[in-house]
């Protein structure tokens, strides 16, 4: 006999949809028919518009179903935005996995002398990021579709920031770190926000292996801001 959860999973598999499955010690198995790191979404659209202050600027954001943190800018992204320090090396900034755009747009607004690239695999999120850039009159940006960094292999960056898709799995996140190192200029920096319970210690260890260094820049409410600098 199958459990009720097993029958639900079998029914979903028969639909042919992409599935994201996460296992948590407290919450058990969670089955999601779509997630924010999916390229396309069949979830019905239900756009919402709201205001949010970041780095002293009030932004108007439009969000939708099937995008990350649609009701407000999540705490981890806010902490990353507030903790980030402009690198000493000149060059562009990359918001890796931009979603509807809060990280990239807020940094572009403040660092007007820098060009900010914003990439994501989720087509709905990219459309929202473009709308939010226009609505907030942010012009020093380029928004592209990219699965990790595969769509911007021709670019090098002074800084890369990411709130990585933890539920996509550790291997995906660590691959993002590896690709980010290759995409950085010498003395460029990778900034990552990740919760302790979702793997901050192992993420720091991976960054140390890749870069030879990794620093905890901030810790609040279980969220870690990690920075690694490329020296060669």
Describe these PLM feature segments.
Residues 174-186:
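A short glycine-rich, Lys/Arg-flanked "PGG" loop and its adjoining helix->strand segment in the class I
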Residues 187-194:
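Conserved beta-strand signature within the Rossmann-like core of class I S-adenosyl-L-methionine
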Residues 76-162:
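Conserved SAM/SAH cofactor-binding pocket of Class I
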Residues 107, 179-181, 207:
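Class I S-adenosylmethionine-dependent transferase superfamily signal
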Residues 195-212:
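Conserved class I S-adenosyl-L-methionine
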Residues 219-232:
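Core SAM-dependent methyltransferase catalytic element
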Residues 40-89:
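SAM-dependent Rossmann-like transferase core, predominantly class I methyltransferases
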Residues 9-55, 66:
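N-terminal auxiliary segments of SAM/dcSAM-dependent transferases
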């Amino acid at each position: 006999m199958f459990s009720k959860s097993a029958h639900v999973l079998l029914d979903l598999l028969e639909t042919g949809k992409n599935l994201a499955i996460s296992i948590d010690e407290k919450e058990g198995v969670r089955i999601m028919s779509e997630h924010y790191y999916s390229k396309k979404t069949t979830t019905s659209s239900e756009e919402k518009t709201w205001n949010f202050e970041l780095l002293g600027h009030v932004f108007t954001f439009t969000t939708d179903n099937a995008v990350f943190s649609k009701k407000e800018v999540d705490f981890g992204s806010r902490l990353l935005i507030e903790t980030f320090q402009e690198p000493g090396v000149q060059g562009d900034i990359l918001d890796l996995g931009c979603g509807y755009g809060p990280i990239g747009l807020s940094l572009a607004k403040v660092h007007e002398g820098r060009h900010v690239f914003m990439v994501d695999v989720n087509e709905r999120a990219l459309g929202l990021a473009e709308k939010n850039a226009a609505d907030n009159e942010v012009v020093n940006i380029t928004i592209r579709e990219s699965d990790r960094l595969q769509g911007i292999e021709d670019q090098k960056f002074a800084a890369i920031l990411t709130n990585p898709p933890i539920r996509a799995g550790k291997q995906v996140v660590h691959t993002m770190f590896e690709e980010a190192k290759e995409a950085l200029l010498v003395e460029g920096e990778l900034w990552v926000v990740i919760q302790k319970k979702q793997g901050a210690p192992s993420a720091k260890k991976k960054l140390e292996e890749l870069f030879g260094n990794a620093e905890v820049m901030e810790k609040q409410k279980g969220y870690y801001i990690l920075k690694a600098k490329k020296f060669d």
